[in-house]
A protein has these predicted regions:
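Conserved, structured core segments of small domains
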Residues: 1-113
Length: 113
């Protein structure tokens, strides 16, 4: 099995005025995603939601800047790390990630021997 990082990019504006009901729906969708990974041939190794992009601090050399590197509508909001036998399986898993206000990126994790 190989590891794949599923990066979740979303427009944070979708959550700015979110009701408790919407936030509950989002959490339930992520719980259902986590429960279904093994049925698709993968194994969920970890994951987390990130604080809003406004809380980011970026470093470039000795320069420290508040906020993310790039001004963009969609920001990295969370990730999942999955074990999967191949990229096709990782993509099948990624298609089920609830990214209501954006999309996902799948990247293989490098291994060093």
């Amino acid at each position: 099995m190989s590891q794949y990082m599923i990066l979740i990019y979303e427009d944070e504006a979708g959550y700015e005025n979110a009701t408790p009901e919407l936030l509950g729906e989002v959490m339930e969708a992520h719980n259902q995603f986590a429960a279904g990974v093994e049925q698709l041939g993968g194994k969920l190794m970890g994951g987390a939601a990130l604080q809003p992009g406004t809380t980011a601090t970026s470093l470039r050399g000795s320069d420290v800047t508040d906020g993310p590197f790039v001004e963009t509508k969609e920001v990295l909001g969370g990730y999942y790390l999955v074990d999967a036998p191949d990229l096709d399986t990782a993509l099948a898993v990624a298609r089920t990630v609830p990214a209501r206000f954006g999309g996902v990126e799948v990247r293989p994790v490098m291994t060093f021997e």
